[in-house]
């Protein structure tokens, strides 16, 4: 591959490529198979948006037909390295090296379509006219993480405290548990940002593989049926598949946590939502002794705790999760990207008041409330009494 100083992208997954890079580090496609000068994010045949949003109004950030997403800013792009946990990529490479898992993933991606997976969700699809406050919060999170297309969002009561990202190599969708819709503002943005991080990191396919191989049992473990059952030869064979999937699942959650943290940029919000989510209770987290919790966080790298997490959980333990988030907030990567995000998401300044030569502007001497007087009402008068319009003040001047 040759370059002329311009950025080039993988023709399959649109990852940024380095000069003379023989293959894409994200999807493994040889660069000779296709290099795109710019990442194409829309459908050129879309009659609604024209492909890259040219037919949409400036206020429309997502195409309802092809799901094209308007970038946060012109040429805005966020590399996956900005939030991906290093062990996450290593664990995915391990999964790809396991023949049965790779075969299952290829079969799932090639034969089981996304609509079939979506049909199994048993939920309500969100949109501009269906729970719009959640939908548009999801659109914002997707734009912050520079997704090219907007994933479908569903709300389901099947697993009320769960949040899933499923799909294949090319398309994904997100299922939000009904209880989690109680989150508002930055708390909801963090939750949705996590799921957009799963999409951006290519987790949807392997999440779907876990659904098919391991089922939907929460917190599946390789010793979940006891030590004697663990020593069963059939169980050992099953664990050979489960163990790498569980290891990847734990690392994938750290990547998602970092993506959500990058979306909101507020450590207190991240810690609160992770605590509420892990405990499956909103009020219980507020009753926790934070000093005692910090002691647990400091001890979370203990070898015995790490072994317990490895054998007993497909999600990271809360204390370790909080410690890793604390470390991420201290990195220059997060600080630098938050400066960029805040620059492009900052609300525009309020318009300056238009000067009207026929109006006298003054403030109440008691409460400071702004007042406006028409000059015509003062015509021929040297003095006039006016009353502050503030009901709580009412001072005569």
List the predicted regions and their residue ranges.
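Active-site His/Glu-centered metal-binding helix of metallohydrolases
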Residues: 192-201, 255, 259
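Short pre-active-site segment immediately N-terminal to the catalytic Zn-binding motif
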Residues: 129, 176-190
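A short alpha->loop->secondary-structure connector
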Residues: 171
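Hydrophobic alpha-helical transmembrane segments in multi-pass membrane proteins
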Residues: 216-222, 232
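Hydrophobic or amphipathic, alpha-helical segments that drive membrane association/targeting
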Residues: 2-167, 281-282, 334-338, 348-373, ...
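Short helix/loop segments within enzyme catalytic domains
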Residues: 130-133, 137, 141, 145-147, ...
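Pan-zinc metallopeptidase signature
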Residues: 266, 272-358, 362
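Catalytic Zn2+-binding segment of zinc metalloproteases
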Residues: 196-215, 224
């Amino acid at each position: 591959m040759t370059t002329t100083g311009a950025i080039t992208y993988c023709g399959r997954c649109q990852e940024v490529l380095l000069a003379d890079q023989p293959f894409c580090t994200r999807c493994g496609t040889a660069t000779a198979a296709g290099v795109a000068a710019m990442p194409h994010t829309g459908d050129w045949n879309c009659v609604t948006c024209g492909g890259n949003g040219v037919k949409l109004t400036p206020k429309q950030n997502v195409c309802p037909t092809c799901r094209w997403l308007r970038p946060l800013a012109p040429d805005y792009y966020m590399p996956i390295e900005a939030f991906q946990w290093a062990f996450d990529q290593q664990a995915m490479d391990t999964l790809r090296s396991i023949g049965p898992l790779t075969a299952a993933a290829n079969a799932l991606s090639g034969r089981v379509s996304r609509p079939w997976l979506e049909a199994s969700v048993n939920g309500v699809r969100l949109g501009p006219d269906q729970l719009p406050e959640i939908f548009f919060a999801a659109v914002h999170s997707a734009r912050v993480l520079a997704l090219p297309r907007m994933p479908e969002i569903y709300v389901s009561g099947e697993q009320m405290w769960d949040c899933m990202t499923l799909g294949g190599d090319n398309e994904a969708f997100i299922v939000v548990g009904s209880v989690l819709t109680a989150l508002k503002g930055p708390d909801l943005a963090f939750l949705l940002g996590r799921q957009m991080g799963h999409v951006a990191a290519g987790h949807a396919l392997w999440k779907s593989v876990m659904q098919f191989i391991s089922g939907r049992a929460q917190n599946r473990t390789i010793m979940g049926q006891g030590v004697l059952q663990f020593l069963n030869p059939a169980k050992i064979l099953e664990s050979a598949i489960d163990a790498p999937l569980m290891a990847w699942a734990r690392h994938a959650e750290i990547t998602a946590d970092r993506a959500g943290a990058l979306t909101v940029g507020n450590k207190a919000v991240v810690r609160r939502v992770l605590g509420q989510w892990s405990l499956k209770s909103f009020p219980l987290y507020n009753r926790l002794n934070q000093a005692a919790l910090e002691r647990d966080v400091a001890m979370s790298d203990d070898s015995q705790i790490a072994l317990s997490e490895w054998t007993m959980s497909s999600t990271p333990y809360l204390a370790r999760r909080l410690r890793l988030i604390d470390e991420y907030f201290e990195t220059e990567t997060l600080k630098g990207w938050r400066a960029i995000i805040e620059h492009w998401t900052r609300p525009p300044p309020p318009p300056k008041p238009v000067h009207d030569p026929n109006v006298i502007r003054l403030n109440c001497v008691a409460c400071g409330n702004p007042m406006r007087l028409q000059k015509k009402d003062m015509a021929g008068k040297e003095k006039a009494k006016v009353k502050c319009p503030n009901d709580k003040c009412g001072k005569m001047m």
